[in-house]
């Protein structure tokens, strides 16, 4: 969601001219400070989309800027964006081979908002954002919603708006699931080995059966550390077996 504001500087106005861009670049070059020294999101938060949730199921990234979509210019008025993502989506997409040419990109279908549960979370999250922005502490900035806009009110309208203005958060997982031997949907065994292939493991976010409720960077580092231990243990056993065989021979 995006809101126009007053009585505040945002990157929209600071970087919407060549002079502004030069001032930002100069501040960073001389002092290593200013907008170029900051992460795009200045605020992050975890929240529950509704009272029935037992733990946080949505995550906020708030940026002091606004634009229609990635790659387009910033809006010419001061504004901020409150991006909210569903941490536990129920929709499932797929990745499929496009042809026998290994160099050709696969066909990726995300299926965002394809389940009723995800559409409800989207609608509830937008309503929660409106309540937060309507809090007394925010009123000095006179926030005015313009994306998607106050005319969207019903669950269906809000879910549709989320689909129109939403984008990926770049955390795809689960395309190469790890699982038990009796799980027909698991491509990998519990040791991260590709079933039916000798000497091949997969070690990245694709092995997660379900995404974790937050940024996957740390869990993937942990998976890599665990995989290193598995590989070293297998290597040690193999070397031990070879040494024992030689001695017996």
Where are these predicted regions, by residue range?
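Mid-to-C-terminal "cap/lid" subdomains and adjacent gly/pro-rich loops that border
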Residues: 1-76, 131-136, 153-156, 160, ...
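Structured core elements
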Residues: 2, 46, 96, 177, ...
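Short, glycine-/Ser/Thr-/acidic-enriched flexible segments
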Residues: 8, 52, 65-67, 87-89, ...
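Generic recognition of stable, solvent-exposed alpha-helical segments in well-folded globular domains
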Residues: 40, 117-124, 128, 153, ...
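C-terminal segments that line or cap access tunnels to active or ligand-binding sites in enzymes
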Residues: 44-50, 58, 63-70, 77-144
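A glycine-rich dinucleotide-binding beta-alpha-beta segment and adjacent secondary-structure elements
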Residues: 59-69, 76-83, 136-211, 217, ...
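Cytochrome P450 core scaffold surrounding the K-helix E-X-X-R motif
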Residues: 93-95, 105-108, 187-189, 210-214
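A conserved FAD-binding loop/helix module that cradles the flavin
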Residues: 211-231
